[in-house]
Amino acid sequence: MTQQSHRALTIKPADMVVFTAMSKKYFYMRFFVTKFVLDQGVVPINPFTSFDYFLLDAVERDTVRRANNTLVARADELWVFGDIADGVRAEVVQAWQQHKTVRFFAFRGDKHIYEVTIDDLVYEDGVEPLIHIGE
């Protein structure tokens, strides 16, 4: 039996994988975020495309949290999209504890995504602001 060639075998893997963190209120933006990250030349790990069923409470929340923590740990960087929810804040803190680069992005209109600084972040009600001391 001979091995057939396939185009996928000639394509070099991306050098970086990023975890995309965002509030569930931006669930509807998950595919635009995935496209944005792919367009940057890196590979996204998007929990809302991997674990969207957790919103239906079909799986224990702590099971999904463990899965998210594992994916954050395996990713090279963490990119945050939109307002900071309490779970997103926890993912950022984890990434910083693991000495990962964290980048922040906001949405303008329906589909425009742009990078912002930590000083420009918007927090959901009751979420403590992020303070990052050094890398």
Task: Give the ranges of each region predicted by the language model.
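Conserved catalytic or regulatory cores that recognize and/or transform ribose-phosphate-containing ligands
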Residues: 1-135
